[in-house]
Regions:
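Short secondary-structure junctions and interdomain/linker hinges
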Residues: 12, 383, 399, 538-541, ...
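Bacterial Sec-dependent N-terminal signal peptides
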Residues: 1-22, 543, 550-551
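Intrinsic structural disorder/low-complexity segments
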Residues: 5-10, 263, 287, 587-589
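C-terminal PAP-associated
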Residues: 21-525
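Extracellular/luminal regions of secreted and cell-surface proteins that mediate adhesion/ECM remodeling
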Residues: 524-597
């Protein structure tokens, strides 16, 4: 183990020196100010299927037909394990994007509403839902009405809780622009600042993330060659001031992939990132498929972490690979490395796009009291016969550090049963450490039409296992014919206020391509409690031998707690135990204070 850690540190140093990229300052951009305009009926529900031209570069690469497949040592082939979690769909409704190919749905929530956005015939449109019931508040609005250039789509919707602001984004139909609309207040139906950032070429597949510790709103795009990343100044965008726009490029492409993408890491929850943390970007590298980059191995593959260093005074930046984290073997050759056609459907020879090139949006990060977590999910060929499964990975490092010391805490490939493909995952984690993952499913078995399903796990479940039985969010009723485009991404967000409700939007097929918006919550165990906090009552300069400590116990299970046992240890001292009774632990989320002395 010590030898492996030493080697990892050496690789980190070499990659930093080899792959540091300088930036290009593209100028300062000042926003316009505008208000909402409803979308027209033709923008919301096109009568003819609309196919969005993007995923630049795939068509230029010859498909690799070689058949190298190493065993997937973390393949979860059975749906049930010794411990079972469960989740409930609180509500689910049809979303926007009907008959779009692809719809590219995205979703987030504030204290009152949920916003979903998709592609349409005239750029991105979005709908506002009641957060508690899922009822539609505003049927459909067009992002183009918010100002700037005409939009083309690829929307991403994000809510930034520290400032209570909405960020609505898409790319332009001409002029190579990223269009970013920032709400001037917490009201998503109020006025917006609209930024039009001009890129050096068409910014395909834009993905975004916040890094408050670097005062940055960052983006990644596919512009041909290595992925391009951008930095915008967060504090100025929140006030409607002029923002710098800084471009830099990831150090190298992944050979074989025509489409090059890297995903920004986006922080969830109220716990801040460590002071001085810089923006992170993440991608996977299947070294058998890509044959470039280092290190290289015949028995495992890699998660790459790249870090952006920004100088706002000089408007410059660099991006460098800081770490290669070992993961089990993945197989990116789902019908080769570039094909748009792979996933089987019932009753047709038409197959669907597997989206194997990218860590799917988004890559959430959450800070807990004793560690930091990043989640990643992607598609992999589980059997060498073009059946897709979902590889998911949880990276961890100690709390309050910014060093490149991430480790692979756990990983698994979710592909139970036989025949059915699972792809287009979206994953997130709540304040308790519960993980929910939703994805598309399909096979050529009769009735197994393109649908949306989910699984999940609790933090104390066996590592590498999704213990929640696969649950259908919405079942498809028909196969898609005519073209192979399915969706470029799904989106799973977390309620920033209760920090335990997951909001998901994804694609299914019911006579037409449609999207679904749903609210999901992990069910509590029947009898469970957790330590919410601890404190020293009163005031003083230090702890003496008889100092009393208060421990706040929170009920996290569904059964009320009337008594329990609490154990504690100071350093390497003896373990002490106290029996307690309670009349306050009478519902999920209720607390009681137990005093230790």
């Amino acid at each position: 183990m010590q030898k492996r850690l030493l080697q990892l540190g050496l690789f980190t140093l070499l990659n930093f020196l080899s792959y540091a990229q300088e930036s290009e300052f593209l100028g300062n951009f000042t926003p316009t100010i505008s208000h909402l305009v409803p979308a027209t009926a033709s923008q919301v529900t096109p009568h003819q299927q609309i196919i969005k031209p993007n995923f630049k570069g795939r068509e230029l690469i010859e498909v690799d037909q070689s058949n190298t497949h190493n065993p997937d040592w973390v393949w979860q082939q059975h749906a049930t394990t010794e411990k079972i979690a469960s989740a409930s769909v609180m509500w689910a409704f049809q979303g926007l994007g009907t008959n779009m190919s692809p719809p590219d749905p995205t979703v987030d929530a504030d204290s009152n509403v949920v916003i979903e956005s998709t592609n349409s015939g005239g750029g991105a449109v979005y709908r506002i839902f009641n957060k508690n019931t899922g009822a539609t508040i505003v049927s459909s609005l067009t992002m183009q009405s918010l100002g700037g250039s005409a939009g083309l789509g690829d929307p991403i919707v994000l809510y930034y809780k520290p400032a209570r602001r909405w960020f609505l984004t898409e790319f332009s139909s001409s002029g190579n622009k990223l269009l970013i609309h920032v709400s001037q207040t917490s009201n998503p139906q109020g006025a917006y600042y609209t930024y039009s950032f001009t890129c050096t070429s068409f910014p395909d597949y834009p993905k975004y993330g916040f890094c408050e510790s670097s005062d940055a709103f960052v983006a990644s795009t596919n512009q041909g060659g290595p992925p391009t990343v951008y930095a915008m100044k967060l504090s100025t965008m929140l006030t409607g001031a002029t923002s710098p726009f800084i471009k830099t490029t990831i150090g190298y492409t992944l050979n074989g992939f025509g489409f090059q993408s890297i995903t920004p890491v986006d922080l969830e929850g109220d716990n801040a990132a460590p002071a001085g943390m810089k923006p992170l970007f993440i991608r996977h590298r299947d070294d058998e498929s890509h044959s470039n980059g280092s290190p290289d191995s015949g028995t495992n593959d890699w998660i790459e972490l790249w870090e952006m260093t920004i100088n706002w005074t000089a408007n410059t930046a660099t991006v460098a690979k800081i770490q290669d984290v070992v993961i089990g073997e993945i197989d990116s050759k789902l019908c080769g490395l570039t094909s748009f056609a792979c996933i089987k459907q019932p009753g047709t020879t038409n197959t669907l796009d597997p989206l194997r090139e990218t860590v799917m949006y988004k890559a959430p990060m959450r800070v807990f009291d004793d560690h930091q977590t990043i989640l990643a999910a992607l598609a992999t060929d589980v059997d060498g016969a073009d059946r897709a499964g979902v590889r998911w990975v949880e990276l961890r490092r100690a709390s309050n550090v910014t060093t490149p010391t991430w480790v692979n805490y756990q990983e698994g490939t979710y592909a139970p049963g036989t025949g059915t493909s699972r792809w287009m995952p979206a994953i997130n984690i709540d304040k308790f450490g519960n993980i929910i993952m939703a994805y598309s499913t399909s096979s050529n078995t009769a009735g197994d039409f393109p649908s949306i399903k989910m699984t999940g796990r609790k933090p104390c479940d066996p590592l590498g296992q999704m213990t929640m039985p696969e649950t259908t969010i919405i079942a498809g009723t028909s196969s898609k014919t005519g073209d192979t485009r399915w969706g470029d991404y799904h989106h799973m967000s977390i309620d920033d206020f209760d920090q335990k409700t997951f909001y998901f939007t994804g694609v299914y097929h019911n006579s037409q391509t449609k999207t679904n918006v749903s609210a999901i919550r992990m069910n509590p165990d029947v009898l469970d409690a957790s330590i919410a906090n601890a404190f020293v009552p009163g005031t003083g300069t230090g702890c003496g031998s008889s100092t009393q400590i208060g421990v706040i116990v929170e009920q996290t299970g569904s059964t009320n707690i009337t008594s329990g046992v609490l154990s504690w240890q100071v350093g390497s001292g003896a373990i002490s135990t106290v029996n307690y009774t309670s009349t306050q632990l009478n519902g999920v989320g209720t607390t009681d204070t137990i005093y230790l002395s």
